[in-house]
From Swiss-Prot:
It catalyses: (R)-pantothenate + ATP = (R)-4'-phosphopantothenate + ADP + H(+). ATP binds at residues 13-20, 113. It comes from the Bacteria. Belongs to the type III pantothenate kinase family. PANTHER family: TYPE III PANTOTHENATE KINASE. Keywords: ATP-binding, Coenzyme A biosynthesis, Cytoplasm, Kinase, Metal-binding, Nucleotide-binding, Potassium, Transferase. It is found in: Cytoplasm. K(+) binds at residue 110. The keyword Endoplasmic reticulum does not apply. This is Type III pantothenate kinase.
């Protein structure tokens, strides 16, 4: 067990497939963990069992089951106007975090189990969004729900647009199909909000970011793996001074 510092605290988001932990010292994020189901036996609570914790769960595991001392955040805790009652708490927290760090208007592209786009307008109000199957989910669904199609991992480089085998045809659909969907939605966002910023986050962020590089100017978007943590931080201490987190820092924490 690590002796805690007095200003240390946890942020915790329990997702559909992973647990996301962050260790803060005051307002500074010092370490993160993104745990798969196989890794849950070694969660950070073993080393820091008595720290305060603020968090939320959108998965099947309740927050208190993972960390009994945790303060559970709800949608009602997020002062974001125009949210609908069934908006995913993870989406709301990520959007709230993006607003604190990057300002408005903003579109959060979360490339997780689902691929979601969540918007805030220039009045810092929730302005709608989109829910699509995640790119990994699309790949698995083709293999799981058809008799003859194989599982094809996400392409690591642009494939041929017109596949000449089953595998290359699926790879093309995953790559160019997802790119076309994102381009259509993000073009519409930037047409409506010319000063808007796009922030990419989530487990498949590297793949989605590669797609955005093919059609979106670099000054219109950035990457940030910690939007939910910024949102939790802002709810824990609304008066805290928020520092910027440029995209080159996203892999600083492990």
């Amino acid at each position: 067990m690590v002796p805690p510092e007095t200003n240390q605290w946890f942020a915790l988001m329990i997702g559909n497939t992973r647990q996301h932990w962050a260790l803060f010292r005051g307002e500074h994020l010092s370490r993160t963990w993104h745990l798969t189901p196989e890794e849950l036996a070694c969660n950070p609570a073993q080393d820091y069992p008595n720290l305060p914790c603020w968090g939320a769960s959108v998965g099947s595991v309740p927050l208190h089951q993972v960390y009994p001392r945790a303060i559970a955040l709800t949608l009602e805790d997020i002062p974001l106007p125009q949210m609908y009652p069934t908006l995913g708490l993870d989406r709301a927290l990520a959007l709230w975090g993006a607003l604190q760090v990057y300002g408005a208007p903003v579109c959060v592209v979360d490339a997780g189990t689902a691929l979601t786009l969540t918007l805030a307008n220039d009045r810092r109000e929730f302005a709608g969004g989109v829910i699509l199957p995640g790119v990994g989910l699309m790949a698995r669904a083709l293999a799981d729900y058809t008799a003859a199609l194989p599982y094809v991992p996400l392409p690591t480089e642009p494939p041929r647009r017109w596949g000449t085998t089953t595998t290359t045809a699926i790879a093309s659909g995953l790559y160019y199909g997802t790119a076309a969907i994102l381009q259509a939605y993000l073009d519409a966002f930037l047409q409506e909000f010319p000063q808007g910023t796009v922030i990419v986050t989530g487990g498949d962020r590297p793949f989605v970011s590669e797609l955005l590089r093919t059609f979106l100017d670099s000054d219109r978007w950035c990457e940030d793996d910690h939007l939910v943590f910024w949102g939790i931080r802002a709810l824990r201490n609304p008066a805290a001074k928020i520092e910027m987190h440029p995209m080159e820092r996203i892999d600083e924490f492990h």
